[in-house]
Amino acid sequence: EGVKKFLEYQPEAVVAVGGGSAIDSSKAIREFALKINNYGKVGLIAIPTTSGTGSEVTSFAVVNDTAAHVKYPLISESLTADEAILDAELVRSVPPAITADTGMDVFTHALESYVSTAHNEFSSALAEKAIEICGVFLLRAYLDGSDMHARKKMHVASCLAGLSFNTAGLGITHSMAHQLGAMFHIPHGRAKAMLLPHIVEFNSDINKHSKSQKEYLPAVKRYANVAHILGLSNYNKVMTVRSLVNWIQFMQKEMNIPLTIQ
């Protein structure tokens, strides 16, 4: 329906205002419409009203097939918006539950891009700052939605994390959350929050690790760095990663995010 309307109207530009789903829909509509009739350059301006997906600065879009219970990720440079406008006033009234879900979406984006095997200095720097902001301001934004300083910080963190994973990519938390959300209609950020502690344990193998630092998996050092950014530490890297898992679960409990899908 969106593609049909687009081709009928033939706009000079598309303004996508909303959360990740609205922005992704606009991206996909423009993409497929111009494949049918490429009548010229059509700009896309993305204005996010949640602090979560970072879709305003990525070359990704996710399309949800509600009948088949499947989410399809689309990836193409042509999906990237031409301009992104960040205004934290647009997230002032976001309810606490959505603030929690989208905030953990930001954190997961930053964490997964940071530990990605495709990371580089630029993506890592962006991810580190987003992680630092989440550690300080996510709970503040959840507890007091009128705290505009926290809102602004989380809005920026969402964009930073989007820029990071657009370069470095994401991990299995993201892909599993797509299918979990599509099948059980769980908000994407909430699904990722529920999965993330288990994925960190799996990727770092902290439940089976030898105490010999020589045998640590590469992900252990990266996860330990994340823990340090959050102000967490312990007497060795494995225990430091364990403190990161505990911090994620603490945030879930503080923001009333379920620990399981039951």
Language-model regions, residue ranges each:
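N-terminal small/polar loop signature for handling phosphorylated ligands or for N-terminal nucleophile
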Residues: E1-N38, L139-R151
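Gly/Pro-rich interdomain helix-loop hinge
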Residues: I186, R190-Q262
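Short glycine/serine/threonine-rich phosphate/pyrophosphate-binding segments
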Residues: S21-A28, T53-V57, T173
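C-terminal and late-domain segments of enzyme folds
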Residues: A100-L160, S164
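Flexible, glycine/charged-enriched surface loops at secondary-structure junctions
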Residues: A118-L126, A141-K153, A168-T173, Q213, ...
